[in-house]
């Protein structure tokens, strides 16, 4: 009987979070949170790991204690500042102690500069219910960076409040080199001192006083560059990171003689990105939004030639009229099996024609992959390298077809 009860208990998941939050004057607040997960099987249940900003563990029977202090921006002032410090002690995580967030933000009117490691959300999607964006989701630990941005939509001049813009430019550094070295254990490549770059631009056409329709368009691009790549045979590939290379990453271009042969032929670094679009309609008591995102690894994925409609994340978000059951419903379809075609080929004297394909999403020949601390930075439905048993930091299952549904609500005021 005891064995049977233990089996039933271990097959069920027990998630026991407890949090204390308090707020002081001028936006200063703190939080203390603890969580424990007990489960059967080999790993923690997927949705207790994914989209937690890396504050989770795939190892079953894990726990953490999280404490943080934050100051929020004062949005009613032209100039404001914010900061945050969040530290975690954990059991059966990739680290026993780590800093989850440490940042300072300065904002003047609509412009902001942010320095440090900060959790950020998805673009055009519901952070609570979406499976996650293709380039940047909420799945991995924050990357420390210096980020200059227009973080929220602001009206573009002379458009009578119809046109709105936002965007950012950032440079930073990955912090998981010791984890990579431990995880690979000499079985596959890993990198040290890898640098990070991202940029994005978004445009929204909306004036709800005159029309219930809104349209959003955007592009996000990111790159890994610099650092050293260590191979199992002892080879070390050192990649350039001069000031000129920072510009080569911002304006994607070939590497110079100090770069690898591949980066001299192609583009310096590992580049990823996505196009996004959304159309919304606001009814008097509810609203609906359809969105689309296409991921790309290189030029073949960026052009219309290879069918941007084939590999994409499409979704529908419905915010319902006030009711005691369901507030918001999100449905999504993800497809990544095309990848610009079956193979990649450069023209030769024998065959004077090039074929671009086999994009191998989230992977790269020099860098570990589009991951941080083993968790994919993009959509978590593409299985993260931390699940690999062979010490490989590549995304081994990146051709995916999946459906996702999420909903939230407040059926009782007691919750």
Give the ranges of each region predicted by the language model.
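Transmembrane beta-strand segments of Gram-negative outer membrane beta-barrel proteins
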Residues: 23-65, 74-85, 167-171
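Short loop/turn motifs that connect adjacent beta-strands in outer-membrane beta-barrel proteins
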Residues: 23-29, 71-82, 94, 107-111, ...
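Membrane-embedded beta-strand positions of outer-membrane beta-barrel proteins
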Residues: 30-34, 83-85, 115, 167-169, ...
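Transmembrane beta-strands of outer-membrane beta-barrel pores
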Residues: 34-42, 71-73, 87-91, 108-110, ...
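Residues that define the transmembrane beta-barrel architecture of outer-membrane proteins
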Residues: 57-65, 96-100, 139-149, 193-199, ...
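Residues on the lipid-exposed face of transmembrane beta-strands in outer-membrane beta-barrel proteins
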Residues: 65-71, 102-108, 115, 146-152, ...
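Internal, well-ordered domain-core segments that constitute the primary functional module
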Residues: 121-232
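Outer-membrane beta-barrel pore domains
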Residues: 258-415
């Amino acid at each position: 009987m005891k064995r049977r009860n233990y089996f039933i208990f271990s097959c069920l998941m027990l998630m026991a979070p407890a949090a204390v939050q308090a707020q002081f004057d001028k936006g200063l607040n703190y939080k203390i949170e603890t969580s424990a997960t007990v489960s059967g099987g080999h790993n923690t249940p997927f949705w207790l790991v994914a989209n937690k900003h890396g504050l989770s563990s795939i190892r079953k029977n894990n726990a953490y204690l999280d404490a943080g202090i934050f100051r929020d921006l004062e949005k009613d002032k032209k100039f404001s500042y914010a900061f945050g410090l969040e530290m975690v002690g954990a059991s059966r995580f990739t680290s026993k102690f780590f800093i989850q967030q440490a940042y300072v933000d300065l904002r003047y009117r609509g412009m902001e500069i942010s320095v440090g490691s900060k959790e950020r959300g998805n673009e055009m999607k519901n952070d609570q219910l979406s499976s996650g964006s293709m380039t940047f989701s909420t799945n991995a630990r924050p990357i420390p960076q210096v980020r200059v941005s227009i973080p929220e939509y602001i009206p573009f001049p002379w458009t009578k409040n119809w046109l709105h813009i936002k965007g950012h430019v950032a440079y930073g550094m990955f912090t998981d080199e010791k984890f990579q070295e431990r995880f690979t254990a000499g079985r596959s490549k890993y990198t040290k001192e890898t640098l990070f770059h991202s940029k994005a631009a978004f445009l929204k056409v909306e004036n709800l006083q005159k029309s219930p329709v809104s349209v959003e368009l955007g592009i996000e691009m990111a790159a890994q560059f610099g650092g050293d790549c260590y191979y199992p045979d002892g080879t070390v590939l050192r990649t350039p990171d001069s000031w000129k290379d920072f510009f080569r990453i911002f304006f994607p271009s070939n590497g110079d003689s100090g770069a690898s042969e591949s980066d001299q032929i192609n583009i310096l670094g590992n580049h990823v990105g996505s196009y996004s679009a959304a159309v919304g309609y606001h009814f008097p008591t509810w609203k609906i939004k359809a969105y689309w995102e296409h991921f790309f690894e290189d030029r073949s994925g960026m052009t219309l030639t290879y069918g941007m409609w084939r590999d994409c994340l499409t979704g529908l978000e419905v915010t319902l009229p006030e009711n005691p059951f369901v507030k918001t419903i999100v449905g999504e379809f993800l497809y990544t099996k095309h990848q610009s075609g079956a193979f990649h080929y450069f023209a030769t004297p024998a065959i004077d024609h090039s074929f671009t394909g086999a994009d191998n999403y989230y992977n790269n020949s020099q860098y570990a992959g589009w991951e941080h601390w083993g968790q994919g930075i993009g959509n978590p439905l593409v299985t993260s390298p931390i699940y690999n048993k062979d010490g490989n930091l590549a995304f081994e299952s990146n051709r995916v077809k999946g459906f996702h549904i999420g909903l939230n609500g407040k059926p009782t005021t007691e919750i």
